[in-house]
Structures are given as C-alpha cells and as structure tokens.
C-alpha cells in the first residue's frame, strides 16, 4: 500500500511555482491573451473582451503592496480600506488576471495528457454537448441498471485550498486565493451555498469555473489513478468532454477507494460493462450486471467523498433503478430504454411457432413540464403554458422583438432536435410564437387579430416553423424521402458548446 502512496505523490510531484513572479510582469498578460492562451478551456467567450486594461491590473496589484494590507483575518470588516474606493471592481479586475495566470500551467498539463492519450484529434468533436447522446444510444441499450449520482456538496473552502496544495507549492498563491474567497464569502461557509455561487459565478466566472473544475477533476483523477496502478487491463475507451464546466468520460474497471492515507487494503473487481458519464454536478453510472455490483459502486463513491474530501454524501443521493423502468434526466432530456416487443410467426414443417422478439431502444424525450416552468419564469407564458405578452420588450422595434423570439426559438429547436418525439418541441415553439405576436400587439395597443390583419406579420412569423425545414432542404432535395425521414428522426449537432438557460431551470 505504500507503493500506491508513493505513486500518487510522484504523479503529483509536478507542482507549479508560478504565481507572484508572473503577476508583476505585464507581458504575462499579453501571453495569456495570445494565440495559445487567449481562450480559456474552462470558459470561452465570457464577454469581457477589452473591458479590463492589463495596465490597470498591474497598477492595482502595485497599490495592494503599497497599502500593505495583505494580512486579513476572519474578523475583519468587509469595509476594508485595502480595497480602496471601489473594492468590488478592483477585486474583480485582479481576480480576472489571477485566473488567467493560474489556468496557464493547468492548460499545458491538460494538453500534454491529451497528447499522451492520443485523443487530441477528437477533442473538438467531444466539446459538443450532443456528443454524449450518440454514446448513450450506442451503449445504454445493452445495459440493465442505471444509477443517478449527484456529486455531493457542500465542500468547505479550506478543503478546496488543501486540494490545490497537492499541485501548487507557491505559498503566496494560497494567500491571494484566500483573499479572493474571503472577499466574496464567509470563510467559514461552504463553496456550494446557492447565494455564494450566484454572487461569485457572476462577478468572477473564470475563477469560479476553474475552482469548480479542479474540485471535480481531483475526485475523478483519483479514481483513474487507482485503476491504472492496480489493474493489468488497459483502457479500451477513455475520453474527456471539456466545455466550460461540463465533462464527458467513459471509464472501465474502476476500483474500490479507501481513505486518503491508503492504510487499508485496496481490493478491485473487474467490470468491463460499467459506463460513467458526468455532466456538471450529476453522474450517470450504468451497468449490465446485477444490482449487487451497482450497490458496490455506490459504496465506493460514498467512501471516496467522505474519506478523501470530508464531504458527507447521503446514500439517497445515489439511486439504482432498472434502466427499462426508470427515466434519468441528463442535459435537459429525459432518457430511458424502451422495450419494443413484436411477435414473429415461424413455421417448420407442420409445426407453427410464435416467437416474441424484444428490441431495446433509447428514448430521449423533451421534458415539457420543466420547459413550460422555465418559460413561465421568463414571463413567456403562465404556469399552465398559456402564452402571454412580454411588456419589458415593448420599447424595442418590431424587428428586434421578432429577432429576440426567433433566437430563443432557434436555440431550443437546435438543442432539442434529437428528441424521439417532436410534439413537445412544437408546443414550445407555438408558445414562443404566440407570445411574440401578443408582445407586438401590446406594443401597438391592439388585439392580436387586428394587429395581424393590419400589419401582415403572419408570414414573417412563419419563420418559427419553417427555418428548420429550410436548413435541412439545403442538404437534401425537398422531394427526397430522406428529408421526410429526417423530420421524424433525431438530429444531433456537434457544434453546440453550451445550452440555453431555459434548459436548466431548477
């Protein structure tokens, strides 16, 4: 067991000593925004662009040292003169530069791991959210049991800092990290309280996503490490889906995980039919084996979280159900395996046999109730799904109002085009279309019927229903049977890097 501990320490021995020498050199910020580092793999297109001057960041850091208020305690007042006149803006600007510098070595390490795993060529395709669903269609129809797992929270901030200590040996790095965390939340609180996440993720999205990614990657790293060091079988398939905070992976032959000091014996079992998929804070674990082995996996995950991360995970957070009787929610879809039964009559000489054939098919359905709840929250309809006007947008021009509704409709249609049943998607498009008409009628202080009759906008609003057909017809002829089949079948897009906010309404 000491051998495992040595291996783990050796694999983590490439610690980074990078922070303070870089923060004072403006050219590192230029490097961060250069061809290689101008986009974070953790968060793309955050929308900051040129809002933050690199010279301002350097001056703010210099002012921090001149004021000499780097030492803080848990009892300090939020109105610390250290932050100057606009402490929120100062902290936000510095944290942006801080996050960029921190991401550089981890980005290089991730790129090297991709090259070693020979999956760098497929990295671009794996960035699409829809790349998960072909994998589910290919594998889950052969499995029997599924387990919904929610990655436990909360995790204490001090535990998060201690996890980073495995990889970074620069003490000033942790002083500055604690400074940012203390500024945005109570140090004695937890990382995943809703109020703190809402505040921190909006003001510091880059730093927040980096910390969240690191926490999740660490627990998955331990599982992969233990499996690699204790099994003679190599991975047949392993890949990472990296888009903002979303990951995708398939892991086989994972093992039993004990306390972080590895003082207990490590025992592993081989399970070539286990499949693991994670999206945000939720995991899906599926297997072909009996519930007994799935319960073992449940124990392994709980033991890892409690012993290594000191996070209490309730057993009810992990549910094990037959895949044919349970629908699991992932990426805004409801998915389950449907059994299609058919009877075939077979005759041999004078004997006739009836043979029942069962074919498994993965059903991926649009969750109509959560979507209507999201639309009602966004004031497009009421809780019953009846469209209402959007008075907030009434000050915009007619073209802008229609364009806003069309963009939302396009995004949802694009995202949910892989659904097995399109009726729910058509209902959502109808709600948005009628809400758009009511908004225009409200702006012109008219009824819906009178507005459509006077302005002739009905033809323009047909784009809500015809755009998808026009796009597909560019590839296939209109009279083609393939075109008709595509309207009924699923279409997965490999260019979707993020989902609409309406998809993730809680």
Swiss-Prot record:
Cellular location(s): Plastid, Chloroplast
GO biological process: mRNA processing; RNA splicing; tRNA processing
Keyword RNA-binding: yes
Entry function: Usually encoded in the trnK tRNA gene intron. Probably assists in splicing its own and other chloroplast group II introns.
Gene: matK
GO cellular component: chloroplast
Record's protein name: Maturase K
Lineage: Eukaryota, Viridiplantae, Streptophyta, Embryophyta, Tracheophyta
UniProt keyword annotation of Plastid present: yes
Organism: Pisum sativum
Family the entry assigns: Belongs to the intron maturase 2 family. MatK subfamily.
InterPro entries assigned to the protein according to its UniProt record, in alphabetical order: Domain_X, Maturase_MatK, Maturase_MatK_N
Molecular-function annotations in GO: RNA binding
UniProt entry keywords in alphabetical sequence: Chloroplast, mRNA processing, Plastid, RNA-binding, tRNA processing
């Amino acid at each position: 067991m000491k051998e495992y501990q040595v291996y783990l320490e050796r694999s983590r021995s490439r610690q980074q000593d990078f922070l303070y020498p870089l923060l004072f050199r403006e050219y590192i910020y230029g490097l961060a925004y250069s061809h290689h580092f101008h986009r974070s793999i953790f968060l793309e297109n955050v929308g900051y662009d040129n809002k933050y001057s690199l010279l301002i960041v350097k001056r703010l850091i210099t002012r921090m040292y001149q004021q000499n208020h780097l030492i803080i305690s848990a009892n300090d007042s939020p109105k610390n003169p250290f932050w100057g006149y606009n402490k929120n803006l100062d902290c936000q600007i510095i944290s942006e530069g801080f996050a960029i510098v921190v991401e550089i070595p981890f980005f290089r390490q991730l790129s090297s791991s991709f090259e070693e795993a020979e999956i760098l060529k497929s990295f671009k395709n794996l960035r699409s959210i829809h790349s998960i669903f072909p994998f589910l269609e290919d594998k889950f129809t052969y499995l029997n049991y599924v387990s919904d797992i929610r990655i436990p929270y909360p995790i204490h901030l001090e535990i998060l800092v201690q996890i980073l200590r495995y990889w970074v040996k620069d003490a000033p790095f942790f002083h500055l990290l604690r400074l940012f965390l203390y500024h945005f939340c109570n140090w004695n609180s937890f990382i995943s309280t809703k109020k703190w996440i809402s505040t921190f993720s909006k003001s510091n999205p880059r730093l927040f996503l980096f910390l969240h990614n690191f926490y999740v990657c660490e627990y998955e790293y331990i599982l992969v490490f233990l499996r690699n060091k204790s099994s003679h079988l190599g991975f047949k398939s392993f890949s990472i889906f990296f888009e903002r905070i979303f990951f995708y992976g398939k892991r086989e032959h994972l093992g039993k995980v004990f306390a972080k000091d590895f003082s207990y014996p490590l025992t592993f079992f081989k399970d070539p039919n286990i499949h693991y998929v994670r999206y945000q804070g939720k995991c899906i674990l599926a297997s072909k084996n009996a519930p007994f082995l799935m319960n073992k996996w449940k124990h392994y995950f709980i033991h890892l979280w409690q012993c290594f991360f000191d996070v209490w995970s309730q057993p009810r957070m992990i549910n094990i159900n037959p895949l044919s009787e349970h629908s699991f929610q992932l990426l805004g879809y409801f998915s389950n395996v449907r059994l299609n039964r058919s009877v075939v009559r077979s005759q041999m000489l004078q004997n006739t046999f009836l043979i029942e054939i069962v074919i498994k098919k993965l059903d991926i359905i649009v969750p109509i109730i959560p979507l209507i709840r999201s639309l009602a929250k966004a004031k497009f309809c009421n809780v019953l799904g009846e469209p209402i006007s959007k008075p907030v947008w009434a000050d915009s021009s007619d073209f802008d109002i229609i364009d806003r509704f069309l963009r939302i409709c396009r995004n949802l249609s694009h995202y949910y085009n892989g659904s097995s049943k399109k009726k729910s998607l058509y209902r959502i498009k109808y709600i948005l279309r009628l809400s758009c008409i009511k908004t225009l009628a409200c702006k012109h202080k008219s009824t819906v019927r009178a507005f459509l009759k006077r302005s002739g906008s009905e033809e323009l609003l047909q784009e809500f229903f015809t755009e998808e057909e026009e796009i597909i017809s560019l590839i296939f002829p209109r009279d083609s049977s393939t075109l008709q089949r595509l309207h009924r079948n699923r279409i997965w897009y490999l260019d979707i890097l993020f989902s609409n906010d309406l998809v993730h309404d809680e």
